[in-house]
């Protein structure tokens, strides 16, 4: 690793979107959906050059004829063949690099099964022949990106949400809490409540339309009951959305009922705590001396933290849970959708990080389990 010219690749494989680019850049070069699509129908026209699988944006644009599968669910890879396709697409089509020439920094959710990162390591070294690799914890990278060394990160993506308290650069594993409630569950919930309005969305392709409605129109209410009354008494909260076939649908209280499930998971029939209680419980698992620093540095990260109003609402809920004199501050960086990637880009370009890489030699010597010793 002596020559400085070799740029490391940073790949943040989210359950919903894959963000990839070069270490040292301030934003990912490629952002595409983590989707592999396979044709639902038999081709009738020869010579069309149809493929048996499409990845990312191409799958998204041909979704009308494909069955779309997400190989990553709740932050855990459930289909390694499809995952390999996504990585192949990332390296060769999106970044246009030879992976055997660049170290690769991957990311994963905390409290993932150990086998998951071992398999990631194995594929990087054996399939893509990378010279070196590293697996970073997503929330820790987000904190790097916000320029802090102490804080609690509430990271919520498409597949998994988690709260990770970090003090002076050390993550506190005993206090990390994971919530398998995230963007994809909200999309499914929105599909369900739109059905109650008489709009049926059922296929995997239609789910993508609902995801778009969610991203464009949903917001978090500061006071849910008040907002429900407001929605019932007037139509000022209603917005219209044009479907791809030109028909227009109207969305009303669904706009805030959908993300409300983050605070009231019982909406989804889930028994877990909302993101505010999870954040609070995570802080309470930490040493009493550092709680004040955590309450004052609650950092939001991930695509599901992008709803307008989520930071004011989280702050309001935290004030009700915390001791009365405690100063609560929720930080919502504007680039939080990509902050995991940005943190990875910062980390991989630090000179002090260069001896942290797992090299091909170390892998050949110790096998995939090396990842637990070198990445924590």
Swiss-Prot record:
Top-rank taxon: Eukaryota
- Where would you find this protein in the cell? Cytoplasm, Cytoskeleton
If you read the UniProt record, what top EC class would you report for this enzyme, in one word? hydrolase
| Start and end residues of each stretch annotated as DNAseI-binding D loop | 40-61
Record-linked InterPro entries: Actin (IPR004000), Actin/actin-like_CS (IPR020902), Actin_CS (IPR004001), ATPase_NBD (IPR043129)
Say what the protein does: Actin is a highly conserved protein that polymerizes to produce filaments that form cross-linked networks in the cytoplasm of cells. Actin exists in both monomeric (G-actin) and polymeric (F-actin) forms, both forms playing key functions, such as cell motility and contraction. Has ATPase activity.
Mind telling me what this protein is named?
Actin
